[in-house]
Amino acid sequence: MKKARRGEDLNLRLVSSLLVVVAEGHFGRAADRLFVTAPALSQQIRRLEEQVGVELVDRSSHPVVLTAAGEVFVADARPALEFAVRAMNGLDALERRRARRLRIGFINGAAGSLGRAAIDSLHAEVELVQLDWSQQVSAVASATVDAAFVRPPLPVLDGVVLERIGVEPRVVALPRGHRLAGRTSIEISEIDGTVQVSSDGAPPEWVKWWSVDPRPSGVPVRYGPSVRTMDEALEVVANGRAVVITAATIAEYYTRSDISFVRISDIEQCSIDLCTREGDSSPAVIELRKAVSALGADR
């Protein structure tokens, strides 16, 4: 390893790439997320290692993990990266307020008909941003988006508020050939022992609630492939590798011949919430809040 070039400013883009590699545990998957080739990503991490003067990742490990020095580096570098991202997002949010633009985050199917109606009623220019399940609240807190339509239960971060829009039943997405696929409704015990999708990046409490874990029967929930979005989850379901419990509106949002959505009759309903920053008094956000409140009151 070359001697660290201490006078060189730390490249936060390279730090961000390192965090993706660690999260994925694999250069190829991380490269796919970053829209670069695996060799190019490996060179980026080498460049960062040369800059700090130590090896940060153990490339011989499967999955790829941080070295001891990498653990120390990431612990200190992650807050700096998050601070820089928040600073840039704050400037972007200020510019959007001035231009009366609104950036709204969503996970596929989360907004439902009420959310779509609220968006359609706005006078502000709207940009929609698709979020991973793990980003539903954090994207609002960091000002990556101005608001988001989310699916609780979610951890409430400081400065972020949730407003209930509506509630609806939950359904289970099953591969078309599943023994329960032709039913109009089932009880949760009928899928006890069936493998459920997981999501490593999402809050564990959120994953468990949506999987109805623990089950009333006491049967342990079996978790399978980890996914980040509903699109990924449904691909896993279609391939027969797991099932996913989700909101009834997902069945309206996705029409697929290889998947059946069946209502679960004996579990708690789910909600749709609007997530915004508590102190955000921009005209576009206020307009969105009012639209959501009015539509919710009409139901």
Task: List each language-model region with its residue ranges.
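N-terminal short secondary-structure element
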Residues: 1-44, 73
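Residue cluster at the C-terminal edge of the helix-turn-helix DNA-binding motif
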Residues: 24, 33, 46-55, 88
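Central regulatory/effector-binding core of bacterial HTH transcription factors
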Residues: 97-156
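Alpha-helical linker/hinge and terminal dimerization helices associated
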Residues: 51-52, 73-101
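Beta-alpha-beta core module
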Residues: 155-163, 168, 231-280
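Flexible hinge/capping segments at coil-to-helix
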Residues: 162-170, 174-196, 286
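Secondary-structure junction motif
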Residues: 114, 151, 184-188, 193-218, ...
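A short LG(V/I)-centered, amphipathic sequence patch enriched
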Residues: 47-66, 71
